């Protein structure tokens, strides 16, 4: 067909429909020619050479091209893998700025690779492939970006009021009985009133979604075993929502559906945080396919080994690392982040393996260009930024090292709280730090307790139920002979591996689940709950379900009584936290009086009621401790400048196996007060019938349990 090509504009990158036609623009520094490829409904291809190039941006405007048009690029240039160049115009490439993508990667043959499969393994990536792959790869889509937000804005929930719920778009609703079957596992499924009602009743304020950037499942390795890339940590584009989660269509309808989901969640008071993977792409190492950035300009977008540019630096364990040091790569990331905030109304981001983004040359640098440009951006200054503060490279564990404006997944919190409740020695001091927001990690560079994203479980590892039911991972279903997944789970099965009908073991496991949830919700910092933990979700001991798109990963909404009780206990905990600012302070504890009174804002005690000494923190076998939190000593005023006060509380932690009698503290007159029992984790719910402890009474705390008392005035 005849297509009239106008010169068009350099910006914006990608495809942009102006109501009369569409502008196309692609950055490639080393290309010698670029072809725009249009596809009709029958997949017939029309190629149009982009003749205009300015500042390495190839561009053109096509009148009459409208939303729903599918397209891709073929990029010509040198095939010199030893020098890092892997141009091959036989490969149709996804537009890195495409706002929608139609279709999934199909087939498992040699066509999608830039090199030939006809040579020996050690040399095959050096030989140019003559095979065309347009019939196998997803197509970019022109979209109309207009949407009636009806006044919707970012919620800007204060950090100290935030409760995060991490979940998977498909897994959360795939089996929900009250959601129409055609909507389950989709953006529309999350927007359904039944899904939102569950989150609202829990008290969730922020939904953290596992990757929704369009990702690929490479054919072969997983698909040959009947598995797939379920988690989605192999992005192939950073603007398009994954089309596989759309109930309405894949020619731009998925964008509208995603926006409708965000709007529905915002109306319910729930923010949307995206798990984003800017550290690598799904193209893998030198033996991976050419689907987008590799074929567009490999030396620009990826970090290559200096003395052998055929190979890729890999700080992620996924075969490649984006070269964030190049201005165009930084621009790609920043344009993507701004797009999701301004066009999709997303409230924040969790950066997967964020340390990889801060590497300059080889070392992680908290003053890197990535942080500089993030901190200067007025759009991103208003959203939540969360780092997974590590990568797989040398020196990659950076917990506590990120700069201001950033919160971090606190991996030390997870490890310490797990160790404490399984009865490990020498954990008291670390546990106390973690319970108070980890000031030893986050207070030194000007950050506050909200820098610590506290979690006990996350998508990567055991669920809460499995944490107290398995001591070893059981990943046989992944097809890797149980060799994948972390061996160091800090878990305890309570005496039997896996399922059991022993009532004592079941009672202990239920108590431990409540201990973990109560510790999480009553700690300073920001709690993150793994979706499904509130209802006892199990993965049968699999701690790495990245490839399990089945009932092993999907939520089971048919709950027994124990799990119904756990849901209600979790609701009560979250409501309690939201009612009491003493558990979500905006400033650090001082360990001294703040408003001139004789009682410190926090005091730690032995079970006998005496104050902890420096020496006692180092008693390795001690596994029981008490803490007093003074609600009259809150350092931050209300938004109107008024002084805030709260109730005061005593908490008793007993990680020993036997019951311990705790005496009420004998200092500051605390033994002269009456105390009301609020939580005892040996019970399935919050205490309903009032139980009062007076000064001469000891408080029995059964083994492996937590008790919370409220001071009566």
Q: Where are each of the predicted segments found?
A:
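Carbohydrate-interacting/catalytic domains
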Residues: 1-165, 170, 500, 506-512, ...
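Short, polar loop/linker segments at the starts of domains and inter-domain junctions
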Residues: 47-48, 177-193, 470-475, 640, ...
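Conserved, mostly hydrophobic/aromatic
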Residues: 26, 73, 167, 209, ...
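Substrate-binding/active-site clefts of carbohydrate-active enzymes
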Residues: 133, 168-346, 353-379, 396, ...
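A generic secondary-structure signal for well-formed alpha-helical elements
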Residues: 69, 77-79, 171-176, 203-211, ...
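Structured core elements
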Residues: 164-166, 208, 230, 273, ...
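Conserved alpha/beta catalytic core and glycan-binding cleft of carbohydrate-active enzymes
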Residues: 345, 366-531, 536, 544-548, ...
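Short, flexible loop/turn elements at secondary-structure junctions
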Residues: 28-30, 52-54, 64-66, 77, ...
């Amino acid at each position: 067909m005849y297509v009239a090509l106008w010169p068009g504009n350099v910006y914006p990158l990608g495809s942009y429909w102006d109501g009369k036609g569409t502008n196309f623009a692609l950055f490639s520094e080393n290309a010698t020619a670029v072809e725009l490829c249009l596809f009709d409904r029958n997949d017939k291809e029309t190629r149009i050479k982009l003749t205009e190039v300015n500042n390495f941006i190839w561009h053109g405007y096509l009148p009459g091209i409208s939303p729903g048009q599918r397209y891709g690029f073929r990029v010509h240039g040198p095939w010199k893998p030893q020098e890092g160049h892997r141009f091959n115009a036989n490969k149709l490439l996804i537009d890195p700025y495409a706002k929608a993508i139609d279709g999934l990667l199909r087939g498992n043959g040699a066509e999608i690779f830039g090199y030939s499969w006809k040579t020996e393994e050690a040399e095959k990536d050096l030989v140019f492939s003559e095979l065309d792959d347009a019939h196998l790869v997803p197509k970019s889509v022109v979209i109309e970006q207009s949407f009636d937000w009806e006044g919707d804005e970012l919620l800007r929930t204060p950090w100290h009021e935030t409760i995060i719920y991490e979940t998977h778009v498909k897994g959360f609703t795939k089996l929900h009985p009250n959601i129409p079957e055609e909507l389950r596992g989709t953006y529309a499924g999350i927007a359904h009133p039944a899904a939102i009602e569950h989150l609202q009743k829990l008290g969730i304020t922020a939904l953290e979604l596992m990757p929704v950037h369009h990702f690929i499942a490479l054919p072969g390795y997983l698909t040959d075993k009947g598995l797939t890339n379920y988690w989605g940590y192999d992005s192939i584009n950073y603007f398009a929502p994954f089309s596989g989660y759309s109930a309405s269509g894949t020619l731009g309808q998925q964008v509208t559906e995603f926006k409708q989901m965000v709007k529905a969640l915002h109306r319910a008071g729930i923010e949307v945080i995206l798990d984003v993977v800017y550290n690598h792409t799904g193209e893998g190492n030198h033996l991976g396919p050419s689907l987008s950035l590799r074929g567009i300009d490999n030396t620009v977008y990826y970090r290559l080994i200096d003395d052998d540019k055929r190979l890729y630096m890999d700080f992620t364990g996924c075969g490649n690392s984006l070269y964030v040091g190049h201005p165009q790569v930084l621009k790609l990331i920043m344009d993507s982040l701004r797009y999701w905030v301004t066009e999709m109304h997303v409230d924040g981001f969790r950066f997967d393996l964020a340390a990889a983004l801060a590497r300059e040359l080889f070392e992680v640098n908290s003053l890197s260009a990535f942080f500089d440009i993030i901190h200067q951006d007025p759009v991103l200054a208003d959203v939540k930024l969360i780092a997974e503060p590590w990568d797989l490279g040398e020196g990659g564990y950076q917990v506590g090292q990120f700069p201001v404006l950033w919160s971090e997944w606190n991996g030390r919190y997870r490890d310490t709280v797990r160790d404490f409740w399984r009865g490990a020695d020498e954990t008291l001091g670390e546990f106390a730090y973690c319970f108070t927001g980890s000031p030893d990690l986050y207070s030194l560079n000007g950050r506050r307790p909200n820098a610590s994203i506290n979690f006990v479980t996350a998508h990567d590892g055991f669920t809460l139920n499995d944490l107290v039911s398995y001591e070893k991972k059981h990943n046989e279903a992944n097809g890797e002979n149980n060799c994948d997944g972390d061996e160091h789970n800090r878990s305890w099965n309570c005496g039997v591996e896996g399922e059991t009908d022993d009532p004592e073991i079941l009672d202990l496991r239920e108590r431990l689940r409540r201990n973990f949830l109560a510790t999480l919700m009553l700690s300073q910092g920001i709690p993150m709950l793994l979706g499904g933990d509130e209802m006892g979700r199990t993965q049968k001991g699999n701690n790495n379900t990245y490839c399990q798109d089945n009932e092993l990963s999907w939520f089971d909404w048919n709950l027994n009584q124990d799990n119904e009780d756990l849901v209600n206990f979790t609701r009560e905990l979250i409501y309690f936290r939201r009612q009491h600012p003493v558990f979500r302070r905006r400033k650090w504890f001082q360990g001294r009086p703040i408003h001139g009174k004789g009682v410190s804002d926090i005091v730690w005690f032995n079970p006998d009621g005496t104050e902890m000494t420096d020496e006692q923190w180092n008693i390795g076998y001690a596994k029981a401790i008490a803490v007093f939190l003074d609600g009259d000593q809150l350092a931050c005023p209300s938004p109107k400048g008024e002084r805030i006060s709260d109730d005061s509380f005593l908490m008793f932690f007993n990680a020993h196996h036997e019951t311990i009698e705790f005496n009420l503290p004998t200092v500051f007159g605390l033994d002269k007060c009456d105390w009301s029992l609020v939580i005892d984790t040996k019970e399935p719910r919050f205490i309903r019938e009032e139980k009062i402890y007076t000064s001469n009474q000891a408080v029995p705390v059964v083994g492996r349990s937590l008790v919370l008392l409220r001071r009566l005035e």
